[in-house]
């Protein structure tokens, strides 16, 4: 049978293990720090800068670190980021992510995973959940540049080739003020409400019942409750649902429902 490029890229050849050439040095992927008015974004970026400097000292390789701030729309922000990087894949760290010192930014996917969106876990301080929400992500650059559709969730909607990596990458510290806590809960819980699987329902229940000692827990709870109602009312209206990726719309929605 004929051997195709797709066979190589998708690892469809039996009994073959892909390895990188021993002794070869690969450039690290660019890191995008993506923020939108997070109160402690500058503090988080400074910490990430320090981490990158430490990487350069230890591994003699230093990834480019780029701060993309206050771009309207989730999709627009990621596409803008993709046009700023020079590596064939790029990391995305959210503005409210507190990245663990142990997280490995030198990670290199196998050749058949270079067109796959990777997502690492995050620890959610509002509800104690550990899953991909708020986690560090790795995107194929050209895929993001070429994207014209992406669905309600940019990360999972960008491509059918998606890889969830069950390793903790960061703490997602979005609950720094009332609006940020509400916004994060509202966006995520709209998505969870539209899913019908057991795991999504369990996660939604956790958002609706936050940890009693979590900062701004009442605001996050309100966001979750309002998200459930919003998703139920608009479940058949994709255009309205997409507003959860519009930060200007979210601010107006928050002020209407919570003031």
Give the label of every model feature segment:
Residues 38-39, 72-73, 96-98, 124-125, ...:
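Short, solvent-exposed loop/turn segments at secondary-structure junctions
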Residues 95-112:
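Acidic donor-binding/catalytic loop of UDP-sugar-dependent glycosyltransferases
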Residues 26-28, 87-88, 114-115:
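A general structural motif
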Residues 50, 82-91, 108-110:
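Short, surface-exposed basic-aromatic patches at helix termini and helix-loop junctions that form
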Residues 1-22, 107-259:
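Catalytic-site signature of metal-activated, phosphate-bearing donor transferases
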Residues 2-83:
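N-terminal anchoring/stem segment of glycosyltransferases
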Residues 1, 88-100:
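Short beta-strand-to-loop acidic/aromatic patch adjacent to the donor-nucleotide binding site
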